Amino acid sequence: MDKRVFTAFLMAFIIALASCSMIPLAFAKLDSSRPPDIEQVIFIHFVKSKAKPPSEETGYYKLIGAKWQTFPVNLEVNPSSSGLSQDFVIKAIGMAAEEWDSGAYSQLEGIAWYGVAPDLFNDIIAITDKGYDDLAWTSDKLDGCNTIVWGNYPTGGVIAVTILWYNKATKTIIEFDIVLDTDYEWDNATQGLTVMDLQNIVTHELGHGIGLGDVYQSTAYQETMYGYSYAGETSKRDLYIGDKKGITKLYGAA
């Protein structure tokens, strides 16, 4: 077999292995009558212009009351409608996911942080053809896949939306889906301050997907989980004090 053909075949095989459809789905294909222990949370990420930085903070975080129990968490993405190349999208999402795994192994405000104990996210991100209407807006759309797509959310001023489902009895996250709004231009904001930075926003949304809520204190503006963003922002790419405290509270330190 030609080396290039073999390489292409191998990559396709690896992507197929990463597909969430191969994961046992305890809660897949639920009907429209929501099971009593299954709860939905929708996080809406609004745009807000950059404000003057307030005084320093010591680390805000908010837990939603559920977390993943099995790892790694698989991701899939449909890069169509993004206006970006598939390679760029995969790389940006991969870097966002890795930030929650390792947080760049930093020393910050006297806190030595070396990531969390489990390897949270699968390093391989699958490609899907699912769209906005295929996401788990209702329980009958649950499929065990954590899907990222671009779409037009009906409310103005919304950058992204994360839909999360969890089991109230076991406090276990079942699935999350992310919509990145097509009202905005997406790219690398270090090369253009008028765009929404893909890595920046996805890092925030993945925080919801693994169990963290938004924080809105004015002094929490440096946190990845601060609930507002703006075009050109890149600070959410890097976890801050509260983000690291929160994720360590959920999953333990490495």
Task: Name each model-derived stretch.
Residues 20-86, 156-170:
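Disordered inhibitory propeptide/activation segment of secreted metzincin zinc metalloprotease zymogens
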Residues 84-85, 89, 235:
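Short acidic/polar beta-strand-loop edge motifs in secreted extracellular
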Residues 73-75, 146, 178, 223:
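A broad, low-specificity signal marking well-ordered, structured residues that form hydrophobic/aromatic
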